Amino acid sequence: MLLFGRIAAAALAMLAISAHAQTSPPADVSQDTKWHNDQMLYLVKLQRGEGWSATPSGLRYRRVKGDGSGARPSPTDTVTIHYTGRFIDGGEFDSSVTRGEPATFPLPRLIKGWQEGVPLMGVGDTFEFAIPASIAYGMKGKGPIPGGATLLFTIELIAIPG
């Protein structure tokens, strides 16, 4: 009887370990189906959100400051901006605001979401963008950004340098 008890206990332990392994998300979140679904669901919810607009590529945007009357950059311009990048859970992955210094970038060297979104802004405007992976870092990701991530940015367009 003692042997049967040990076998039963071992079997239950194996069953518990097996069940845990099947329900825990993979260490690489970019391969987790639920995680991917959450990324897309976030964008769908924004379609119904107050003040949000969408482009055919899936970029979501809204103006949070300014009136759009400032000069607008072309997709080939260099821009000076303040920005904060976050994941949909609110975690910040990059910010010129945190560093205390605006950044200057040529738009053609940036992700497609910025190439498409920043030219919608006028100097002095602040926009919020929700950028699907397809026009951000794709399914491979880059640095701290996992593949498939929807990225959220708050961007203030400061200048379009000569």
Each predicted region: which residue ranges?
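Cross-family detector of peptidyl-prolyl cis-trans isomerase
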Residues: 2-8, 12-15, 19-162
